[in-house]
Amino acid sequence: MEICEEMNKIEESSYYSKLLIKLKKKEANETKKVFKIPCEDPVKNNLKNSFGKDYDDEGDNGKSVISYSLYGNSPKYCEVAILNVKLAKSIYPEWKCRFYVDKTVPEEVISRLKQENAEIIFVNQEQSEIPGTFWRFLVIDDESVDKFMIRDADSLISYKEKAAVKEWLNSGKYFHVMRDSRMHNELILAGMWGGYNGVIKNMFGLMKDYLKEDMDVNRISDQVFLRKRIWKTVIQSALVHDSYHLGEEGKPYPDYEISDIEKIAFFHIGMIDSNSCTIKTEIEIKAKKVKWYLENENGEIICSYDSFIKKENGKQIIEINLPTFYSSKIKYNKWKISYEVLE
């Protein structure tokens, strides 16, 4: 499909993506454990909470959480994560951003996320033994959470998805799945789905059992897990938005507000934002490692990270992946990169 897209062979790309969806559904049909969907409407059902806790009609019926995994010290993930927390205040003001993290995330990033009122949960030793991409699914085991959305830390939330989420919440369906590219040929994209809590039980146990059986852990293991263990439960009561109708269950996206996010080149839900531009900065002093700073037009530090030096065409450089909103400021000389040598 990648080759078809690069060669602009749209019909072929769509054909093979639809075929892949069909084949993956056949694979998903082998799922043995399927959770039963409650008979009641999800909103009414969650007034008494599917975990068995009773709530008053006028009381706190649990939180709405946007769940992320975050690990490592790359601005490609950390800076987009911080932008998402800021964006959520206007796009999803009633939702709380939560990050499942480990100690590889810089303390400065953790502090900035907390300043923006994000929830930070450090995974424990047992949880840390499963791949980091799976951590965000732990929200499904949290009894305090009413409904959840699973998102990618390196993809910006948007008003397009807000419109889709609103339609889901009004649909009476327990789950929501989105596909927004011809390359989204998976049953559930790991960072593009959500649901009401209480249907799927013991998510951590399901993940551990799956990983014991499937030792071939790779960058899409989380999506394969969702296909093999979760899809059959989800599709019983799901609203699926699918821009290219790759699966027969898909429906078009509703109309949505156009903001600066939707105006980004090649925008689609789930787009890896920091892949659009790699900033290369030459280091003129001989060094192995530097701390670089991103400064705005007023000389204020936006962020700083440590980077190792690379050699390219006889020059010392650092390569930095930054959010589109940052890199565009650098492109037009409004913001700049400075650095100090560490090694």
For each of these PLM feature ranges, what is it?
Residues 66-74:
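A conserved hydrophobic helix/loop-capping motif in glycosyltransferases and polysaccharide synthases
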Residues 103-146:
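Active-site-proximal specificity loops/subdomain of glycosyltransferases
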Residues 96-103:
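Short internal beta-strands
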Residues 157-188:
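Conserved donor-nucleotide/metal-binding helix-loop-beta segment in metal-dependent transferases, i.e.
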Residues 83-95:
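Short, acidic, metal-binding catalytic loop of nucleotide-sugar glycosyltransferases
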Residues 145-154:
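Short beta-strand-to-loop acidic/aromatic patch adjacent to the donor-nucleotide binding site
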